[in-house]
């Protein structure tokens, strides 16, 4: 069976020898300079999958894709299937009272996730680690924007000054402990430009269905690892102690020096079953070809807004959809720290 029309079940039944030959043949047919690297068995949260890696070089940097099997798959989530822990129920109840939300955690989850459905998803190659939509460019001290940002951001911290539309670049402003200011420009671009650029490379954005399938890899639970979430820290923290240290750092005006403690829970940071580093930071979302045009986070809204810990983790749910978030417009700037580019390659 050709890789062009195989399903997850077909892939699992294929012998290593046949799988290797098919992947080598696929690599030879690709115009992207990717080479078939290897087959590796990968375990994630009690499930096992054989991953096919395809590697290449771009500007001297390693880029890596994996083969995502397709076929008829189950997507979406039904809130009544969620089995919350007592701690999750308690966390949500506090948030529901504070923000006047539906008091039922399962009903609320149902409104925040895409509906259960069956879809036919084609097999494809998909990038392991999403990249920045546009690379950063250093800004010279004599540039007028350098002086403006130096006056606006005097504190010793790293911030991003965002542009919202084409022509409004974003700037990363970092002041080192010795007072040295570093400014980098992130050129603005739009979804239209991104998709045109990908098309020239023989690549594309994944659709919502493809992204959801690649993220959950068949997991029927709310999150790809299960239903559970930590009860005393957010996805951007390594543990409760780390969260406390970051709060102290903010209160010190960025003067406190500390090292992040070791992670005590990191299922969201591990490669998922298909071998992807995906949906691990609510502040960052992957661009997609349809629907809301970005999945995998909420721009950090729940965390930044001070919502409870369960709501802070919810945007990492495989089928998460924010009903209050507007769809990204084609003319909107997407080259910022909130959006990432995860490229897909069709197997035609």
Indicate where each model-derived feature is located:
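Charged, compositionally biased non-catalytic regions
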Residues: 1-51
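Extracellular structured ligand-interaction cores
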Residues: 62-65, 70, 116, 121-123, ...
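Extended, Lys/Arg-enriched charged tracts that mediate electrostatic binding to polyanionic substrates
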Residues: 36-107
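Disulfide-stabilized, aromatic/cysteine-rich ligand-recognition loop
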Residues: 1-16, 109, 132-133, 160-166, ...
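Short, solvent-exposed loop/turn and secondary-structure capping segments
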Residues: 78-79, 137-140, 226, 297
């Amino acid at each position: 069976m050709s890789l062009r029309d195989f399903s997850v079940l077909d892939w699992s039944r294929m012998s290593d020898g046949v799988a290797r030959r098919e992947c080598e043949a696929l690599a030879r047919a690709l115009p992207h300079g990717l080479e078939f690297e290897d087959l590796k068995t990968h375990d994630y949260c009690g499930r096992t999958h054989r991953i096919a890696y395809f590697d290449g070089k771009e500007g001297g940097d390693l880029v890596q894709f994996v083969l995502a099997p397709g076929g008829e798959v189950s997507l979406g989530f039904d809130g009544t299937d969620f089995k919350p822990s007592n701690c999750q129920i308690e966390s949500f109840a506090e948030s529901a009272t504070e923000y006047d939300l539906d008091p039922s955690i399962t009903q609320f989850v149902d409104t925040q996730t895409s509906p259960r459905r069956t879809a036919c998803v084609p097999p494809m190659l998909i990038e392991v680690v999403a990249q920045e939509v546009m690379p950063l460019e250093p800004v010279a001290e004599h540039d007028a924007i350098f002086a403006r940002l130096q006056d606006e951001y005097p504190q010793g911290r790293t911030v991003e000054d965002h542009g919202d539309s084409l022509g409004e670049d974003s700037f990363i402003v970092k002041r080192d402990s010795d007072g040295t200011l570093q400014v980098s420009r992130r050129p603005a671009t739009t979804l239209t430009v991104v998709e045109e650029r990908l098309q020239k490379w023989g690549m594309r954005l994944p659709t919502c269905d493809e992204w959801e399938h690649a993220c959950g890899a068949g997991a029927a639970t709310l999150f790809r690892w299960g239903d559970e979430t930590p009860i005393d820290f957010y996805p951007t923290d390594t543990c409760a102690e780390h969260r406390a240290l970051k709060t102290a750092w903010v209160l010190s005006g960025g003067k406190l020096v500390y090292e992040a403690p070791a992670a005590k829970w990191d299922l969201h940071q591990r490669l998922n079953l298909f071998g992807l580093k995906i949906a691990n930071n609510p502040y960052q979302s992957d661009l997609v070809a349809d629907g809301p045009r970005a999945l995998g986070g909420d721009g950090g809204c729940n965390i930044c807004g001070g919502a409870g810990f369960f709501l802070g983790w919810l945007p990492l749910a495989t089928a998460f959809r924010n009903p209050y978030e507007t769809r990204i417009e084609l003319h909107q700037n997407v080259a910022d720290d909130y959006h990432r580019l995860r490229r897909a390659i069709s197997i035609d």
